[in-house]
Design a protein with these regions (language model features):
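Conserved interaction-surface patches within small, structured recognition/assembly domains
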Residues: 122-124
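Structure-specific DNA junction-binding interface
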Residues: 1-103
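Accessory alpha-helical DNA-binding modules that contact the DNA backbone or grooves
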Residues: 106-120, 132-159
Length: 159
């Protein structure tokens, strides 16, 4: 008997977007000679992707599409610099909406680390957080953790 990597012999290998549950639409573009393409971020992993759309009726910028969907072609990754101008303008609002839609997952980042050095290091990974701010965040967090972004903002003085 040969060892396996957790997949049956006749199972297809898992794709990079198989665990994604939603797409949040950043932009809709017309494609030549026909059809449309949407640029999106995936949820929960926040990949930037694009997909051909069979029917743009009901597809709106900023709204989420549940996956899997028969109306979409395959997903392919897009670099941030390759997004259309309108999609780049929409990305901050879409990321905020995705975070708000799954608060527990994202607040968990602040509460995940157990010992002091891991908490300190995790906070230092955030953009704009230096040593003194990371120490302040660790002390403000305490053992109980936070339950909302408002608590984090208030305790740590983050804008």
């Amino acid at each position: 008997m040969q060892p396996t990597d957790g997949q049956e012999a006749d199972e297809e290998p898992k794709g990079p977007y198989d665990d994604e549950t939603h797409l949040r639409v950043l932009g809709i573009q017309e494609r030549r000679p026909m059809g449309h393409e949407i640029q999106c971020i995936t949820e929960p992993s926040l990949y930037i992707v694009r997909s051909r759309v069979n029917d743009v009726n009901g597809v709106e910028i900023g709204k989420a599409i549940t996956l899997p969907s028969d109306h979409l072609g395959p997903l392919s990754e897009v670099r941030l610099k390759d997004l259309s101008g309108s999609a780049q303008q929409e990305i901050v609002a879409a990321l905020s909406a995705s975070v708000i839609a799954d608060l527990d997952r994202h607040i968990g980042f602040y509460n995940r680390a157990n010992n002091l050095s891991l908490k300190f290091h995790a906070f230092q990974l955030l953009p704009g957080i230096g040593n003194s701010k990371a120490i302040q965040m660790v002390q403000a967090r305490g053992l109980a953790g936070w339950s909302s972004f408002e608590e984090i903002d208030e305790a740590c003085g983050i804008d």
